[in-house]
Regions:
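Conserved active-site tyrosine of GNAT-family acetyltransferases
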Residues: 18-23, 93
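Vicinal oxygen chelate
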Residues: 4-13, 34, 43-53, 65-133
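Short loop/beta submotifs within extracellular cysteine-rich repeat domains
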Residues: 17-20, 28, 52, 62-63, ...
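Short, charged/polar surface micro-motifs in flexible loops or helix N-caps
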Residues: 48-52, 59-61, 86
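A cross-kingdom feature marking solvent-exposed beta-strand/loop segments within repeated
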Residues: 5-6, 25, 30-39, 59-71, ...
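Interaction-mediating elements
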Residues: 2, 21, 28, 32, ...
């Protein structure tokens, strides 16, 4: 059911600044993209085997604003795995006891594909995102 690692998200106060070290190492770095519906600005770093997503709060009401406030230098926020069928994956994970965050319905994520998040307490302290590919 769960496929490959799509990305690791790191919450930071300034996404473009955080990505610069990767650009200096030769990685491909995207432009900053505001996602008002998610309350974040994203910058993706493409690596040979996965991506790093830097997420920056977009306004004080951002869902990651408190995380960045507590972790002023930034920190790992979530990991994202690919799935073929997000609804089937949701049902299988729920049947195993995992709790879906939000209203339980997929939202369109940063890649324009459906995503869901699952409670960190059900994944050994890691916030998990699944993305339909």
């Amino acid at each position: 059911m769960i496929g490959r690692l799509n990305h690791v998200a790191i919450a930071v106060p300034n996404a473009l600044k955080a990505a610069e070290i990767y650009r200096a190492c030769g990685a491909e770095v995207s432009a900053a993209v505001p996602l008002p519906e998610h309350g974040v600005i994203t910058v993706f770093v493409t690596l040979p085997n996965t991506k790093i997503e830097f997420i920056e709060p977009l306004g004080d009401a951002s869902p990651i604003a408190k995380f960045v406030e507590k972790n002023a230098d930034g920190g790992i926020h979530h990991v994202c795995y690919e799935v073929e069928d997000i609804l089937a994956a949701r049902e299988q994970l729920k049947a195993s006891g995992a709790r879906v965050l939000g209203d339980g319905e997929p939202k369109i994520g940063a890649h324009g594909k459906p995503v869901l998040f699952f409670h960190p307490k059900d994944f050994s302290g890691a916030l998990v995102e699944i993305e339909q590919v």
